[in-house]
Amino acid sequence: MSKQTQDDIRRIAKEIGEMVVAKNIAYGDSAVDPVRIFSKASPVEQILVRLDDKISRLQRGTSYPGDNEIDDIMGYLILLKIAKERYGDE
């Protein structure tokens, strides 16, 4: 693997990590620690639903202006890994 590819991987991983932290602060950690007012689904299941929605938008070409579905999917996958580490596969 080239040094450029290694650098790109590190740069993008850092950018996605910073985006996830910022959004998680803005949303009050709702992905990993939901308040469960209406939905009683586990954090893992809720994140999977959000991933389904993002992938559906990509497939159908119906993204919202300003959204970056690929970055959001990568972010949800990070949150999914965290939720599975904390709660298992519930």
Regions found by a protein language model. Name each.
Residues 1-90:
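Intrinsically disordered, low-complexity regulatory regions
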